[in-house]
């Protein structure tokens, strides 16, 4: 395999069993490791030594930061940008691929109009809006951001034709994001070129998303709604889920209605057994 970089994964390791595994605990004791994060880091360090000895470089998902990053590792940041930012600030290379902008297995238009997908909502314009180099980085740190990557996980993609449909034209937007300075980007210009690119791809036999007939954002989400409860205090008798907090205690009375999925930060979720139980204090009789 000719690649200089070898992606070793390193994400979503379930460490709970390691805390009671006799062999894991023995290894931690022998290597003077304080916790299971350091045990994972110990393994990643060993894998890197093996790869480096064979002229290769280690690349892994941002969880490889846990317990201490291997000396020469490159981080691929998927759980947001924080992992990549932490990596470059410590002198390591990073590739940005946050799910919010780069996971092409998400719906690209109104879900009711699309083939079944894993979830989410990532239209072309949102992909194009991404900037992989955070404004919080210094010039030197920014140079360690080596680029961006699109990901397409195939649990809901049964055929090559479906794969093409999910990729095109969003991968064109991500490519332009990666090679363009932010100040040179123009969404109207790119959108026009993307429409032409889709026609060209279809003429060559590719199965692309029908950009010309894109539905776009949920109409209700495009403008606030005014009602008597806007701005009023909400008393939560059952808490909202920490996984779906939206904008916290102001969400239900902010007058903002959500887009197609909760990922826009406007949908608040209640998954407790008692579900939704709130009181809205109107401040006066209504």
Predicted regions and their residues:
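Active-site neighborhood of glycoside hydrolase catalytic domains
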Residues: 1-71, 78-81, 85-86
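Short, contiguous acidic/charged loop-to-helix segments that flank catalytic cores in large enzymes
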Residues: 34-35, 158, 162, 267-270
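Flexible, acidic glycine-rich loops studded with aromatic residues
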Residues: 57-73, 78-222
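Disordered, acidic Ser/Thr/Pro-rich linker "stalks" and the adjacent N-terminal cap
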Residues: 217-285
């Amino acid at each position: 395999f000719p690649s200089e970089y070898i992606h070793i994964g390193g994400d979503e390791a379930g460490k709970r069993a390691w805390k009671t595994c006799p062999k894991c605990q023995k290894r931690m004791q022998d290597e003077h490791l304080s916790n299971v994060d350091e045990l994972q880091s110990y393994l990643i360090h060993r894998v890197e030594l093996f790869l480096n000895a064979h002229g290769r470089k280690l690349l892994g998902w941002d969880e490889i930061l846990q317990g201490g990053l291997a000396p020469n590792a490159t981080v691929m940041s998927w759980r947001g940008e924080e992992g990549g930012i932490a990596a470059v600030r410590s002198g390591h290379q990073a590739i940005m691929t946050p799910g919010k902008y780069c996971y092409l297995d998400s719906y690209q238009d109104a879900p009711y109009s699309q083939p079944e997908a894993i979830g989410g909502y990532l239209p072309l314009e949102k992909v194009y809006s991404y900037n992989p180099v955070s404004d919080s980085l210094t010039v030197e740190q920014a140079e360690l951001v080596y680029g961006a990557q699109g990901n397409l996980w195939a649990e809901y993609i049964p055929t090559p034709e479906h794969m093409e449909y999910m990729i095109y034209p969003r991968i064109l937007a991500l490519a332009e994001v990666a090679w363009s300075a932010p100040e040179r980007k123009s969404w109207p210009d790119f959108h026009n070129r993307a429409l032409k690119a889709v026609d060209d791809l279809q003429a060559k036999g590719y199965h692309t998303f029908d950009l010309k007939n894109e539905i776009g954002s949920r109409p209700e989400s495009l403008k606030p709604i005014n009602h008597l409860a806007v701005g009023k205090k909400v008393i939560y008798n059952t808490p909202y889920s920490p996984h779906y907090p939206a904008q916290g205690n102001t969400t239900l009375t902010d007058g903002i209605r959500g887009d197609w999925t909760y990922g826009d930060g406007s949908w608040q979720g209640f998954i407790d057994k008692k579900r939704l139980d709130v009181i809205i204090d109107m401040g006066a009789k209504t």
